Each structure stands twice: as C-alpha cells, then as structure tokens.
C-alpha cells in the first residue's frame, strides 16, 4: 500500500464503518438497541471525562447512551434517542497498537458498549463476536 498519500480515517469514515459493522451484527443483538444514532467525535467531552472519572481521553473508545431494556419493554418512551458515541482518536490509537483491522476494532467497541449496557456477560459478547 502506498502510505505516502493516505490519511487517517475521518469522523465520517468512522461513522460509515460503524453503520456497516452494526449491520453485520446478529439481528437479535441489534434488536436490543431499537433505533440507534452513531455519534463520532475525536474525544469524549468534559462531562464524560468527569462522570467516568477518566484521567486521559484515550481511556475510552466508546459510550452507549440510551434507555435500558426494562424501560423499553414497559413501553415507556426514552427521552433521547439511543446513541453510541465512538471516540475517533482513542480508537485510532488502539488500532495502531494492535494487530486488528479497524473494522474489527469498531465492531468490538459496538458489541461491548451494547452488551455492557444490557448486562451481557463477556462470554455472551465473545460468542456474538465469533458470529460476525
């Protein structure tokens, strides 16, 4: 590959990759989220840093924000849409330091953000990753 003319993936590139990765996940797993919005930012904002008690903006790759399953099953409308925040710079740093494709990294972040929010075990999430 000619790296001389390559650039790091943009915010839009990562959003496109996130949509494709999400679409490749098993339908029963995707159904947990309902309609979802992907928000890609370079770094988490100050409120996320404070709320998550992070010392560095590179400590977090993504964040799920939405109603839990019990809230949705009760038919209660969530005040905000379900969103997954992906943090571009930390994701790119992780990608550069590991032997995984960028698509695999993004898919892993999506699975773990959704899975942790809905209480799935690490074994459950590993099984979902194995299916993709």
What is each residue range found by the language model?
Residues 1-105, 117, 121-126, 132:
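Active-site rim/adjacent substrate-binding subdomains
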